[in-house]
Amino acid sequence: MAPEQREGASQVSVTFEDVAVLFTRDEWKKLDLSQRSLYREVMLENYSNLASMAGFLFTKPKVISLLQQGEDPWQVEKEGPRYFSLGLKCSHRTTKSTQTQDSSFQELIVRKSKRTFAFEPLNMKSENLFIHEGKLEEKWDKNTLTVERSHKNNEFSPKSHREKRSSECKKQISYLSNPPGITPDKRYKCSMCEKTFINTSSLRKHEKNHSGEKLFKCKECSKAFSQSSALIQHQITHTGEKPYVCKECGKAFTLSTSLYKHLRTHTVEKSYRCKECGKSFGQRSGLFIHQKIHARENPHRYNPGRKASASLSGCQRAHSRKKTYLCNECGNTFKSSSSLRYHQRIHTGEKPFRCSECGRAFSQSASLIQHERIHTGEKPYRCGECGKGFTSISRLNRHRIIHTGEKLYNCNECGKALSSHSTLIIHERIHTGEKPCKCKVCGKAFRQSSALIQHQRMHTGERPYKCNECGKTFRCNSSLSNHQRIHTGEKPYQCIECGMSFGQSSALIQHRRIHTGEKPFKCNTCGKTFRQSSSRIAHQRIHTGEKPYECNTCGKLFNYRSSLTNHYKIHVDEDP
């Protein structure tokens, strides 16, 4: 450091307050989820860095405890912030920069995170130091431990000075980051599995996998996580927030990785090319599936795995190494062996997770947890518009369409708009007549798997859905929901024409036909039309002569249940 630059420096102790940003309750409410996520990352990282530098025990600040537990950090106002001093000497650069009241959140966080720290081990000589914004470097003075905190100041750091120090920085970082005898990949080793990490914070995060320690708990569903970033990502499932928006089409996503995959649908980029025929693919899994065609044609000469690797550039291979576990059945790749094992259960049909209440089995533990909520009645996912609760995030997302009216997928046959691609596929089977889900017992086929599962309960006698009020059991959840409205008196389905309310959506659909005059059910014999399917079935008995309703008293037969009910009154009147 030049003498003229040293003159404005002063020595003070570093406290947690120096690297902390605190918000009032009102300020915290104004932050969106991405801003809160950034705040948590900066605060926890700063605390971790200071704690590792201190070398002795100290009281954990309340704001850090709140952040680790997933609580709102403004609650710390009740006690007042408590800070600890590391007892380190801090060189304050002379600065004229001030923090204005109208500074944006991003500027505030970046300003705090730019207060960087640098160390160098004892007996290492390093006369100069180039401060990196937002980076942590180690520098120890020969006799005293110093922490240099840089401020954004044009007078202190003119452009010429930055350029001059730039080349020096590159040399020093290589030396400071990698002291003699210590390789960058083997600084911090896990005692359990001997995996190595380049810094202590990464090692601590990894060790939580062995200890099972999960400090970050969701307030909505009580699910716990070992890392704050995982909790933040999980909380999005409750709020339904989708902060990652595609600039091309406006579609929103909960994860940045989902947005990245989606963006490739807009570009013509197809970076995975088959060397055999030249065909290109946007995703590596697509290339693997395609290469199986060539592998079947010439299995001795062609190796799908090797070809996939050879067809990528050096940079692409570096990215592709992240997914090293390949499914031999379908060609999909996965980041971990556990993810591959979960996936392979789709092909093997293995379902190791069984419900203790009804005996139903699942391939994944998450599916079992979601299913168990049917028995417990737990509904952790709540709609922000109407307050209605749901057992899964997918059901909540389907419900939200009622409020937003968003329907993105149109049927080419009838023009009907649907909210999801999977719903569109099931709907299209109405037009094609396709029924891929077949019952192995009686051979009856269905358009969707959920209908088949409900049907199979007729053969097994299984009725897993029980009413807590009267104990009556049902084969499907929707039947239970409809039944429970008898006890509650709830009628959520209202006709917009006359205001009449109904307990079931099917009853509302039938009622609307009174206003529209629609009669979609036609008799194939005489051409007469009906508003309800049951009315057509009853009418067709006139042509077939079928009389399924028999009087237990006199044995007389009837076409309609209502006719049998009226007939019973004759016997009631005859009784003395």
From Swiss-Prot:
GO MF annotation list: DNA-binding transcription factor activity; DNA-binding transcription factor activity, RNA polymerase II-specific; RNA polymerase II cis-regulatory region sequence-specific DNA binding; zinc ion binding
GO terms classed as biological process: kidney development; negative regulation of transcription by RNA polymerase II; nucleolus organization; regulation of transcription by RNA polymerase II; response to folic acid; response to hypoxia
Record has Repeat as a keyword: yes
Compartments (UniProt record): Nucleus
Any one annotated GO CC term: nucleus
Tissue and organ expression note: Predominantly in the kidney.
TM helices/strands, residue ranges: none
PROSITE patterns in UniProt: KRAB, ZINC_FINGER_C2H2_1, ZINC_FINGER_C2H2_2
ZnF (C2H2-type) residues: 188-210, 216-238, 244-266, 272-294, 325-347, 353-375, 381-403, 409-431, 437-459, 465-487, 493-515, 521-543, 549-571
Gene3D superfamilies in alphabetical order: 6.10.140.140, Classic Zinc Finger
Crosslink site: Glycyl lysine isopeptide (Lys-Gly) (interchain with G-Cter in SUMO2): K125, K159, K242
Ranges spanned by the short sequence motif Nuclear localization signal, renumbered to the chain: 170-189
InterPro entries according to UniProt: KRAB, KRAB_dom_sf, Znf_C2H2_sf, Znf_C2H2_type
Name of one Pfam family that matches: KRAB
Keyword check for GTP-binding: no
Keywords assigned by UniProt, alphabetized: Activator, Developmental protein, DNA-binding, Isopeptide bond, Metal-binding, Nucleus, Repeat, Transcription, Transcription regulation, Ubl conjugation, Zinc, Zinc-finger
All copies of domain KRAB, residue ranges: 14-86
Function comment: It may play a role in renal development and may also be involved in the repair of the kidney after ischemia-reperfusion or folic acid administration.
Protein family: Belongs to the krueppel C2H2-type zinc-finger protein family.
Name of the protein this chain belongs to: Zinc finger protein 354A
Species of origin: Rattus norvegicus (Rat)
